[in-house]
Amino acid sequence: MNRHISRALLLACSGCAMMPAWGQDAVSGYAYLTPEMQEMQDDDFANPGMLTVEAGAALFSTPGANGKSCESCHGALGSALDPKQIARYPVYSDRLQKPVTLRARILQCRNERTAGPPLAYADEQALQLEAFVRRLALGEAVNVDADGPLAAHYEAGKRLFHTRWGQVDIACHQCHDYHAGKTFRGQLLTQGQSNGFPVYRFTKGQVVGLQERISECLTNLRAEPYPLGSKQYTDLEVYMSARSNGLKIETPGIRY
């Protein structure tokens, strides 16, 4: 698809008018929900994403082959974890010499210290653990430090966010910086903020992490997704998370 057609598709968004963006205030995807869906997200009993959080809590307390569980170090239900530190992810690991997402840190810690069966990044149980741990920082402001050693990865993620993808030939920022609140191919667009992830998606009927959501977007643009946990997705997560700085964590958010 050529660029004239892809531009026409974007301008077909309901009421589309190009306007300058980033520099605008960060707005959570929560703001684009109906009042009924906001109420559902806010109610722990009604929020379907809480099932994934509860599954993660069970895994957190399950001992591995050496008899240790995540709770052995981090307290019952993660009581010893610092919500402010959770809100700083992704962070740069001096030991690994690369950025580490929250899910990657959980898997690294679990695989090294509990002697449980190793989990892959794309494993459903890895997503459940991430949802549980991030839920512990509910209401904490996202606070990713994109300076210092993360700066190069922030810039790499920004370049990817501004790269045109696939046969549809559209970049992430074209939808999420310019057309938030409008629809594209029947999909309500938001700013693409990360503060609600992992989120429950009504269109999928399941909880997805940020990288899973990026893969869905690339597939919709007829582009080849990267593997979950890849350098490209990690750089994108660094950029998108820093872009959400100041927004309160809502995990598990509800999104369309």
Model-derived segments and their meaning:
Residues 67-71, 79-81, 185-188, 254-255:
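Extended intrinsically disordered, low-complexity coil regions enriched in Ser, Thr, Gly, Ala
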Residues 173-181, 186-200, 207:
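An amphipathic alpha-helical core segment
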Residues 65-78, 129, 157, 167-179, ...:
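The canonical Cys-X-X-Cys-His
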Residues 2-52, 79, 90-155, 181, ...:
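Post-cleavage N-terminal segment of exported redox proteins
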Residues 44-76:
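N-terminal, post-signal-peptide region of Sec/Tat-exported proteins
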Residues 69-82, 86-89, 147-148:
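Acidic helix-start/capping segments at beta-turn-to-alpha-helix junctions
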